[in-house]
Amino acid sequence: MKKVFYTFAGTVGVIAALGGSLAVWVSSQGRDDGATGRPSYGAYTFPKGAPRGGPIPRADGYVEGSQGSKFILPVMPPERAMDVHTAGSVVRNNEIRTCFWPGPKLRPGFYSTDPDGYGVENQLPDTMNTFTTAWFRIPEGAQIVMKGEYPHERHWSFTTYSTNGVPRDSIDDVQIDPDSGSQNPFREGVRRDVMPRRYTISIANGEPPAVRPPNTVYTLAPASAEVGMHMRNYVPDRSIDYLGAVSLPEVELHYADGRVLKGEDACSATAAPLRGKQVPLAVNPKVWQALTKLPWMNPAVGPAHAFESEPMEMFFNREYLMLKTFFPIRAFDNFAVQKGGFWSNRSTRYGYKYLSQEHGKVYAMRGKMPRTPRTWDGNPSPVSQDVDMRYWSICSAMAPPTGMTVDCVFDEGVVPLLDEKGYFTVVVSRAGDRPANATEKCGVAWLEWGNGDGIPGGSSDYGLIINRHTTVNPQFKYSWFAVTTPGRETSAMGAYAPQVINFHEKQRFEALGCPVDTAKIDKMPAQLAVQ
């Protein structure tokens, strides 16, 4: 065991040294290659602009942030009927904030075009989920107490984090006991429109005790340490606002001696350096670029490889992802442990696949759709417990160093498009390469690919797709939670593992007609392999 450890430590040391040297070299070569090979788009925000402002992107998306960061922003995807954030709602949503909760944040263009500003979520967000992020320090012996109403939405949770984005502790909607006389609308048999619906949650320093008190989230850090906490709000009913038609939780600071601070006083007593500011990037863009220039990598293509049909891959943790991406050595599979990263949360597991325009301009994802609730229209009936999971989505995204999402589709928008077998078909391409039959009318959901990795001087061909499974029913055995070994995605998930099929050009997909002949898609991999 020691020999293995020292071998690994030595390998990591060499990798770090090599990566550091290359990073210095790349920095010295830095230039703005943003326009090279990247498509130009007309819109990087809503028509009236982002409510928090920011720089005006160039035609290819290039911007310089308020702190000097340089990125290529993702194009604004077409607005859908079931979008949480629309041109008509973002200004109203932006006003929902307090001294403790700095307001909503999402991918660039929705609330800001400043990649260095709080309003941009830079950790590959799902666009059907709105983040509001609190940073705080809790004094010795004190607790933060939050009071509010359960929201009218699909899923809701609180997760604490380290300053580098590793999830620590969390509590989900169904776990939160209601106040006396109230009911929790996420629980079995309780109507979703029930009133009253109040709750109280505490945030405490340190580790949870052996017998954990109810409604308590822990920092897993010592007193006065800086801690972050995401409040996630998935799919509010009818998108009335990002909080699901309730107010932000009221915050109090309770000291051990009985003193209680509220409002601005509580905010001042818990102030932290990162409050209201952008969180640090999980991966340094210069290091990423350096790694793509390793001898066995193709900088133009990035981490993608050529394939005709393969399953999406399990995301285990940030460290293993970087090792697998740039140093695909099987020995590193020992580090494939489900612990998350990139500000992930414990209720969700993720699948992903790197793509490249160099290998194909049109890809299709196929798989069996898990059963999920229907809540968008404000269905007042109790949340169905007889489902496979609470939430499902597929998103297109840019590279981890920028952490920018391009586009997303979620379960309620995809279910009406399923074929007779209950399988979904999601196509990702650039708008100019979109097949004429990649439409809802033809039974297909479509995602905008975007304009590369988001890094000036990086890859204009880069693509990434991400599949989320959130709050999975323990009785459902075919989710991303079931994947414990790299390369065993299909054996663990069966038909629910999304297969990614490379159509190369839009004409091949258009040949499937309208409605799309999905039986031909399922036979396609073998046919493509011999062409």
Give each language-model segment a name.
Residues 19-39:
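Membrane-interface motif at the C-terminal end of an N-terminal transmembrane signal
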Residues 34-531:
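A compositional/structural signature for long, glycine/proline-rich flexible linkers
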Residues 9-12, 26, 507:
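Prokaryotic Sec-type signal peptides and long signal-anchor helices
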